[in-house]
A protein has these predicted regions:
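RNA-binding accessory domains that recognize and position tRNA/RNA substrates
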Residues: 1-142, 154, 159-188, 192
Length: 192
């Protein structure tokens, strides 16, 4: 197996017309070999004009975090200490958070693969980077509930109904079972 010399969390790009977001990752190997991976999230139930209503200071850090968490799938295939981030920088505290999340989130993977993970994960940061102020995005009081197509989804939905909290379901690649749960509960399911 080729050993990666660097792993770059590349860019993310929103396509409002298609209500999709692509995330790019680049793995570099010796002798200039490169492999690029792309993840794409599609939000078929989100109208194109809604993307402009999300404040940039809310959307940008959200997509940056998504870029980093989705990248775990590629980084664990090509683990390297040389982690790079294109397009934005992290604070020391943010880097420590991502170090911890990757280390603890991949614990079973490291064990199963018999990998030495000591000092393997080190997200880059800039000392001068100041943590941004939390962005305000006032939204109506409501909830977004994962529709896992099982009894827990029904129970959670009933608890939200009982509390008077309006909600919608969301599901990744929904199946007929997801649709049935949504109909049973009487809630809209947003497809992702």
């Amino acid at each position: 197996m080729l050993r990666a010399s660097s792993f770059t969390f590349g860019i993310y790009k929103i396509n409002p017309a298609r209500s999709s977001i692509t995330f790019t990752y680049i793995v570099e190997f010796k002798f200039g070999l490169r492999k690029t991976f792309t993840d794409k999230l599609v939000f078929p139930d989100v109208a194109p004009e809604l993307w402009e209503k999300i404040p940039k200071d809310v959307l940008a850090p959200t997509l940056q975090a998504l870029l980093l968490i989705l990248g775990i799938n590629y980084w664990c295939v090509f683990p390297t200490k040389n982690i790079r981030i294109a397009g934005f920088t992290l604070t020391r505290e943010q880097a420590q958070f991502w170090d911890s999340l990757y280390l603890n989130g991949l614990g079973e993977f490291f064990y199963d693969m018999k990998m030495d993970f000591q000092d393997l994960i080190s997200f880059p940061y800039h000392e001068s980077k100041i943590a941004p102020e939390p962005a305000r995005f006032v939204r109506p009081a409501r909830a977004l509930l994962l529709n896992g197509a099982g009894k827990d989804s029904i129970l959670s939905a009933e608890l939200l109904k009982k509390s008077g909290t309006p909600f919608d379901f969301f599901a990744f690649a929904p199946t007929p079972a997801h649709k049935k749960i949504g109909e049973l509960v009487g809630a809209k399911t947003i497809r992702v």
